[in-house]
């Protein structure tokens, strides 16, 4: 997987986790800083490059904004993200 693909995937995981927290009422999810640190830790465990927090915040915020603008029903997004992010959420 290219560095750009890793970057996009990592930012997408962070954005979708934040979406669950703020839009799907997942109050059990930790602070954004913990989500970011965990995402970088998991990336390093996979042998990926760690991203700077600044880069990850900017890119994940852009993706989060696009997710909030997406016309897919919120319940569908919440269900999909809960299912797809189960392993990552268990790392938090």
Residue ranges and their predicted role:
Residues 28-92:
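Compact alpha-helical subdomains of small soluble proteins
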